[in-house]
């Protein structure tokens, strides 16, 4: 068929392009072809428009293989618009596809006469549809993809030598959303041949990564989008973290996240999990490989998660699967015994075969054999094992409380962590012993059968362990509290006896012990019996005199009570009118009396009488009566926590057999002491030994044997009260501080009831335990007042400052419970001031003169009014007007029960001490200052010297400037601790009050 008008014959160049069609290759890996014309034999079935545009040409290449192309070459005519449309292509789920076009294009310059009409480009279009539209498509429906130009074009010379210049262009199409699409080529005047068209989309291939299988995934709609794909763990594996990968637009897997690990019993091998072989195991999922079974174990099947122990071997419940299987130990060896009376010490060596374990302990089995070793029975609960009978760690044991002349068999078993798993009997070492002769045990039960005026009949039970035939009983008796002077004994052959020849109306103490051929046992507990009183026989005159005497005594007693009630103003404040009671309770009625804070219910101390150790004729008798001797070997000193002139105070532990060590404080007398120093030192222990109260330091015992001299007391973790408060400045509530004072007051009430005068009550002599319980301590020796006006009462342990002592005790050396009350008021001030030194930096001489002139310490910062009023009452000049300790405790109890009464704080209204005013500079001198204290001295006096630089940097060079400071000024100096702010402001407030009242009248209390 002749060529159309304006067209060049295509056969001239189709033949040269035939070889190019054969170069079409299959889709690359990761690419899925939707259309590939190189695989179509014959006509492609595409539509052309108009009819004289594109031509379908079927030729053969040089290999005589058929080849089909679409060609157009209407270069002679202008305004060409020739369309070539593909068949409908299903999308197959792809969001974006790629068109790979292979074509040839002739150079316009190689054709004469076509410069105005020849083009070297063509356009590519696409149209989406959900079905095949047939031939009913319109040009306007298509969307342009791109204008395509050839990288290389051929000329007439190329045709002559059959040289092919093939162009390959790839364009992306999308995003697509409908079921299929068409591609269309628009020719606008080029000499062009389409050799092949491949339409494909990209996908990420299926793969296994990190033991997770990822299925193939189609790329996203955009060239930059990533499609997330979640993997599935391969067989016998489990997720460690969720496995995910991202499929890129180029069909490549990116960014692996998470992974799977092989399950227990399986290990990874070439992207798969394979079972552990026989003899191997894996106990937990993970990356680790299967491990060989530990010693003495095996795996029964592949994929073992644990190895089973061999016969007679075991694994304890807490042993990991990786541990070797072990077995019970063999018996201990070299078991030896050492008999001492009715006790035996057993020692042995560890077993030769520990069974592969190190957790070996020992159990002791005791069997008593009265008749023969073949007929034994359990020893019973009375036998004592030290340290214990089972779970022994050390290879030694003491067995006590055995019967005398008795055969025993002891079995020592060695056990370890798998002994309970073995059905076999435990292996033990055996030793047989016979106890020696021993004295009988203590007589436990003794009771009074009858008591007359001059005789007492007693009845008791035989000892639980007679340890032989009891030959007789010995009864020891004496008048109460006269054992050291004389006592008597009586023999009896039965468990009953009558003691005669006693004094009528006298209290006697009786003790009984048994005797065998081995000796005497211990005496029983003491039992007190009072003999009957004789019947009095009086005549009428005697009876009349007795009645008159009783009546006179009652009258005198009544007068004394009336006198006491009128003169004891403090008692009236508590017992008369409600108006007086409001003085301490802010208008609230006092609460009923309740148990002390530090006593458990129903356990109040029993009243007794204090005995002065120096009144004993024999100095050592007081120590034996009131103290307990402790063996020095039971005390282990760990560190020194204090020292003084007479000795050192140490922290240590007291070993108690069968119990935990007790932490104690040990006061040891220094070497080189005299006998008088030793006697005075131990006299303090004799004093402490008489006290039993939860707010009095408890004496554990003394060490007096040999050259050692030590006093052992309970250990108080927080040390002295003054140091403790200074360390925790501002950290307690008012209620907590009142609770501490209540504890000190309760202890002093107890001492006062006993008739004991402390003479040195101060915060430094009050100790605090871990529960904030305060206990009175330091029961020192006699004190001597020197003639020096600055003197302090001295003891061998040091000086007692004047500022804690009552005026009458300083002036007349008169110490009483009332002088202790004065000291308690100072302790109250110390507690509320958090360990502040009373009277600051005043000398002892100034303190004495100021107190005599009526000065009293002002209320500390934030001190409730009720507490400061109680201090002032304790500092009453007339000691008869001071409260008793029982009344002080009642006031503190009332304040604790009525917290609202502690809200009103006291204001500083007392006059300053004249000595203090004289020692200071003229505060009214402004910033110029005077000739006395500096700002640094003032800060040192209130223990705030650390802030010297702060005040200097703030420009406060004199106390005159300091007096004008407020809370904001103090904070501006960088003082952030609330307790320190309160202390500084409180001192400033005190100085202001002292300044304003310096010229005012003084009054005595």
From Swiss-Prot:
Residues 328-438, 439-534 form the Fibronectin type-III domain. It is a single-pass type I membrane protein. One of its GO terms (cellular component) is neuron projection. Residues 930-994 form the SAM domain. The modification Phosphotyrosine is found at residues 616, 839. GO terms for molecular function: ATP binding; ephrin receptor activity; GPI-linked ephrin receptor activity; growth factor binding; transmembrane-ephrin receptor activity. Disulfide bonds: none annotated. The active site is at 760 (proton acceptor). Glycans are attached at residues 340, 407, 432. Changing residue 860 to L: In a metastatic melanoma sample; somatic mutation. Residues 28-542 are extracellular. Phosphorylated. Phosphorylation is stimulated upon binding of its ligands including EFNA2, EFNA3 and EFNA5. Autophosphorylation on Tyr-616 is critical for association with FYN. Autophosphorylation on Tyr-839 modulates tyrosine kinase activity. Residues 31-209 form the Eph LBD domain. Belongs to the protein kinase superfamily. Tyr protein kinase family. Ephrin receptor subfamily. Receptor tyrosine kinase which binds promiscuously GPI-anchored ephrin-A family ligands residing on adjacent cells, leading to contact-dependent bidirectional signaling into neighboring cells. The signaling pathway downstream of the receptor is referred to as forward signaling while the signaling pathway downstream of the ephrin ligand is referred to as reverse signaling. The GPI-anchored ephrin-A EFNA2, EFNA3, and EFNA5 are able to activate EPHA8 through phosphorylation. With EFNA5 may regulate integrin-mediated cell adhesion and migration on fibronectin substrate but also neurite outgrowth. Heterotetramer upon binding of the ligand. The heterotetramer is composed of an ephrin dimer and a receptor dimer. Oligomerization is probably required to induce biological responses. May also form heterodimers with other ephrin receptors. Interacts with FYN; possible downstream effector of EPHA8 in regulation of cell adhesion. Interacts with PIK3CG; regulates integrin-mediated cell adhesion to substrate. Interacts with TIAM1; regulates clathrin-mediated endocytosis of EPHA8. Interacts with ANKS1A and ANKS1B; EPHA8 kinase activity-independent but stimulated by EPHA8 ubiquitination. This is Ephrin type-A receptor 8. The gene is EPHA8.
């Amino acid at each position: 068929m002749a060529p159309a008008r304006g067209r060049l014959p295509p056969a001239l160049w189709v033949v040269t392009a035939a070889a190019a069609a054969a170069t079409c290759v299959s889709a690359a890996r990761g690419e899925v072809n939707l259309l590939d014309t190189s695989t179509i034999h014959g006509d492609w079935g595409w539509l052309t428009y108009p009819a004289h545009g594109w031509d379908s040409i079927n030729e053969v290449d040089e290999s005589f293989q058929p080849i089909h192309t679409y060609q157009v070459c209407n270069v002679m005519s202008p305004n060409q618009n020739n369309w070539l449309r593909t068949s409908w292509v299903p999308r197959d789920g792809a969001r974006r596809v790629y068109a790979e076009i292979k074509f040839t294009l002739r150079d316009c310059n190689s054709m004469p006469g076509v410069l105005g009409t020849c083009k070297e480009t063509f356009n590519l279009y696409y149209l989406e549809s959900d079905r095949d539209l047939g031939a009913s498509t319109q040009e306007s429906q298509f969307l342009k993809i791109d204008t395509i130009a050839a990288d290389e074009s051929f000329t007439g010379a190329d045709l002559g030598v059959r040289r092919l210049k093939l162009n390959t262009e790839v364009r992306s199409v999308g995003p697509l959303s409908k079921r299929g699409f068409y591609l269309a080529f628009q020719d606008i005047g080029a000499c062009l041949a389409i050799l092949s068209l491949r339409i494909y989309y990209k996908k990420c291939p299926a793969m296994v990564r990190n033991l997770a299988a990822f299925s193939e995934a189609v790329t996203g709609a955009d060239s930059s989008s990533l499609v997330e794909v979640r993997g599935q763990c391969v067989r016998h594996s489990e997720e460690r973290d969720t496995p995910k990968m991202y499929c890129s637009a180029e069909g490549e897997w990116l960014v692996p996240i998470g992974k799977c690990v092989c399950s227990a019993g399986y290990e990874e091998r070439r992207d798969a999990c394979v079972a552990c072989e026989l003899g191997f195991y894996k106990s937990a999922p993970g990356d680790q490989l299967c491990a060989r079974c530990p010693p003495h174990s095996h795996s029964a099947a592949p994929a073992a998660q644990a190895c089973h122990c061999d016969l007679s071997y075991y694994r304890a419940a807490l042993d990991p699967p990786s541990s070797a299987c072990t077995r019970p130990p063999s018996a201990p060896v070299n078991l030896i015994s050492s008999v001492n009376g009715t006790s035996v010490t057993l020692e042995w060596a560890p077993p030769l075969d520990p069974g592969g374990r190190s957790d070996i302990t020992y159990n002791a089995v005791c069997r008593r054999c009265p008749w023969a070793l073949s007929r034994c029975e359990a020893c019973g609960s009375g036998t004592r094992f030290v340290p214990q009978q089972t779970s022994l760690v050390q290879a030694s044991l003491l067995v006590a409380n055995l019967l005398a002349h008795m055969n025993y068999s002891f079995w020592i078993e060695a056990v370890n962590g798998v002994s309970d798993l073995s059905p076999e009997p435990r292996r033990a070492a055996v030793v047989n012993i016979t106890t020696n002769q021993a004295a009988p045990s203590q007589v436990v039960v003794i009771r009074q059968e009858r008591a007359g005026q001059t005789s007492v009949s007693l009845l008791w039970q035989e000892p639980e362990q007679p340890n032989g035939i009891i030959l007789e009983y010995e009864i020891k008796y004496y008048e109460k509290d006269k054992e050291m002077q004389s006592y008597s004994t009586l023999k009896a052959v039965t468990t009953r006896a009558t003691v005669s020849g006693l004094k009528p109306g006298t209290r006697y103490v009786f003790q009984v012990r048994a005797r065998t051929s081995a000796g005497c046992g211990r005496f029983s507990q003491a039992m007190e019996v009072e003999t009957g009183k004789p019947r009095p026989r009086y005549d009428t005159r005697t009876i009349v005199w007795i009645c008159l005497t009783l009546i006179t005594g009652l009258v005198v007693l009544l007068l004394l009570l009336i006198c006491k009630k009128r003169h004891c103003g403090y008692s009236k404040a508590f017992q008369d009118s409600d108006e007086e009671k409001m003085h301490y309770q802010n208008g609230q009625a006092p609460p009923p009396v309740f148990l002390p804070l530090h006593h458990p219910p129903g356990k109040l101390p029993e009243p007794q009488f204090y005995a002065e150790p120096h009144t004993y004729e024999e100095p050592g008798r007081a120590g034996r009566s009131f103290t307990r001797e402790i063996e020095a070997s039971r005390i282990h000193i760990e560190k020194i926590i204090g020292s003084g002139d007479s000795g050192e105070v140490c922290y240590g532990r007291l070993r108690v057999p069968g119990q935990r060590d007790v932490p104690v404080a040990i006061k040891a007398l220094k070497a080189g002491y005299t006998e008088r120093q030793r006697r005075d030192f131990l006299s303090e222990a004799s004093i402490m030994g008489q006290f039993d109260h939860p707010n009095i330091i408890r004496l554990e015992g003394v060490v007096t044997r040999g050259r050692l001299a030590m006093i052992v007391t309970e250990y108080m973790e927080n040390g002295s009260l003054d140091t403790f408060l200074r360390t925790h400045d501002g950290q307690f509530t008012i209620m907590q501080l009142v609770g501490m004072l209540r504890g000190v007051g309760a202890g002093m009430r107890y001492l006062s009831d006993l008739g004991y005068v402390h003479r040195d009550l101060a915060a430094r002599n009050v100790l605090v335990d871990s529960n904030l319980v305060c206990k009175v301590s330091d029961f020192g020796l006699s004190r001597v007042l020197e003639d020096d006006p600055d003197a302090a009462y001295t003891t061998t342990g040091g000086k007692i400052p004047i500022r804690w002592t009552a005026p009458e005790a300083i002036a007349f050396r008169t110490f009483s419970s009332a002088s202790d009350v004065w000291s308690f008021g100072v302790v109250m001030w110390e507690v509320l001031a958090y360990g502040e030194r009373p009277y600051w930096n005043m000398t002892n001489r100034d303190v004495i003169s100021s107190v005599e002139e009526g000065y009293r310490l002002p209320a500390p910062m934030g001190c409730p009014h009720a507490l400061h009023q109680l201090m002032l009452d304790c500092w009453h000049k007339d000691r008869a007007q001071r409260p008793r300790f029982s009344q002080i405790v009642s006031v503190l109890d009332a304040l604790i029960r009525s917290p609202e009464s502690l809200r009103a704080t006291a204001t500083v209204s007392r006059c300053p001490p004249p000595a203090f005013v004289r020692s200071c500079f003229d505060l009214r001198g402004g910033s110029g200052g005077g000739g006395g204290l500096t700002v640094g001295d003032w800060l040192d006096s209130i223990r705030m010297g650390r802030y010297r630089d702060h005040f200097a940097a703030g420009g406060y060079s004199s106390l005159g400037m300091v007096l004008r400071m407020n809370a904001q000024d103090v904070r501006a100096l960088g003082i952030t601790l609330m307790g320190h702010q309160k202390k500084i402001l409180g001192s400033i407030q005190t100085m202001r009050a002292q300044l304003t009242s310096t010229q005012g009248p003084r009054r005595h209390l």
